[in-house]
């Protein structure tokens, strides 16, 4: 079975082809640059860009893989969660291809696909597993009873960790997106220079808004207000702030995991999303948890269509096809957090 995957949940327009064995034949991603000037994603610009470049992105993927639309057996497309306009462009484009080529189509959950990306490149993953999604828009933990079953354990109550990194990068005068720039700065700084506290939200949930505010006050001063301009910082100060922030942000997640892992009796951990590529985070998890850890390669950490095609193929073969695919900005998973309480 040859599966064509389409991804457009945010600002990446992507197309990939995955063969019958799950091997990636092509993985083309167009990253929009228009948002850099605004310091974040402008939904209307993102939608227009998807509409403009989807045909050429699909054409590039077909050429790279050496196949034609007639060779495709299945079309998989991201339909939730994400920016509603961007999702609508992708879903309708996929429906057009499916109708024109008379191929079956299946909708894929973007967050679940991020976790599947880690599974896709791994071998002999044992279940049940803990799925940890860490991206610009989502921070959540899942019980994965198998590669296709996701039950919500906990999530961020406010900002996602990737979004928090981008906002702190802006405080430090860094361009968007700022995650990798924070990581680079932090490698030259002292993580104990500032005493930023990890999240203290009880139970399985997380919070990053307090940490974000603490960093802002550390830069502006405690007596500042919203109109107080950001001061000029030396490179050494930026590095120390970045390192201290990074430690607190990732510790907020890592400190929760030992108790959760014990509660759900998981046998492995799958980590997905753009933030999963952070080496400091990877090492922290390895030092915190005595379980097999699986991270996607860097090309599959960020938004891509290979993970959409891979998961879509598995869902189709498992007869879990989506009837009536519609774009949906938010998705509500079955939650099992109540059954895990109390957690410290």
Curated annotation (Swiss-Prot):
<protein>
    <recommendedName>
        <fullName>tRNA N6-adenosine threonylcarbamoyltransferase</fullName>
        <ecNumber>2.3.1.234</ecNumber>
    </recommendedName>
</protein>
<feature type="binding site">
    <location>
        <begin position="133"/>
        <end position="137"/>
    </location>
    <ligand>
        <name>substrate</name>
    </ligand>
</feature>
<dbReference type="InterPro" id="IPR022450">
    <property type="entry name" value="TsaD"/>
</dbReference>
<dbReference type="InterPro" id="IPR043129">
    <property type="entry name" value="ATPase_NBD"/>
</dbReference>
<keyword id="KW-0012">Acyltransferase</keyword>
<dbReference type="GO" id="GO:0005737">
    <property type="term" value="C:cytoplasm"/>
</dbReference>
<dbReference type="InterPro" id="IPR017861">
    <property type="entry name" value="KAE1/TsaD"/>
</dbReference>
<dbReference type="GO" id="GO:0002949">
    <property type="term" value="P:tRNA threonylcarbamoyladenosine modification"/>
</dbReference>
<feature type="binding site">
    <location>
        <position position="110"/>
    </location>
    <ligand>
        <name>Fe cation</name>
    </ligand>
</feature>
<keyword id="KW-0479">Metal-binding</keyword>
<keyword id="KW-0819">tRNA processing</keyword>
<feature type="binding site">
    <location>
        <position position="278"/>
    </location>
    <ligand>
        <name>substrate</name>
    </ligand>
</feature>
<keyword id="KW-0808">Transferase</keyword>
<comment type="function">
    <text>Required for the formation of a threonylcarbamoyl group on adenosine at position 37 (t(6)A37) in tRNAs that read codons beginning with adenine. Is involved in the transfer of the threonylcarbamoyl moiety of threonylcarbamoyl-AMP (TC-AMP) to the N6 group of A37, together with TsaE and TsaB. TsaD likely plays a direct catalytic role in this reaction.</text>
</comment>
<keyword id="KW-0963">Cytoplasm</keyword>
<feature type="binding site">
    <location>
        <position position="166"/>
    </location>
    <ligand>
        <name>substrate</name>
    </ligand>
</feature>
<keyword id="KW-0408">Iron</keyword>
<feature type="binding site">
    <location>
        <position position="303"/>
    </location>
    <ligand>
        <name>Fe cation</name>
    </ligand>
</feature>
<feature type="binding site">
    <location>
        <position position="114"/>
    </location>
    <ligand>
        <name>Fe cation</name>
    </ligand>
</feature>
<dbReference type="GO" id="GO:0005506">
    <property type="term" value="F:iron ion binding"/>
</dbReference>
<comment type="similarity">
    <text>Belongs to the KAE1 / TsaD family.</text>
</comment>
<feature type="binding site">
    <location>
        <position position="179"/>
    </location>
    <ligand>
        <name>substrate</name>
    </ligand>
</feature>
<dbReference type="GO" id="GO:0061711">
    <property type="term" value="F:N(6)-L-threonylcarbamoyladenine synthase activity"/>
</dbReference>
<dbReference type="Pfam" id="PF00814">
    <property type="entry name" value="TsaD"/>
</dbReference>
<dbReference type="InterPro" id="IPR000905">
    <property type="entry name" value="Gcp-like_dom"/>
</dbReference>
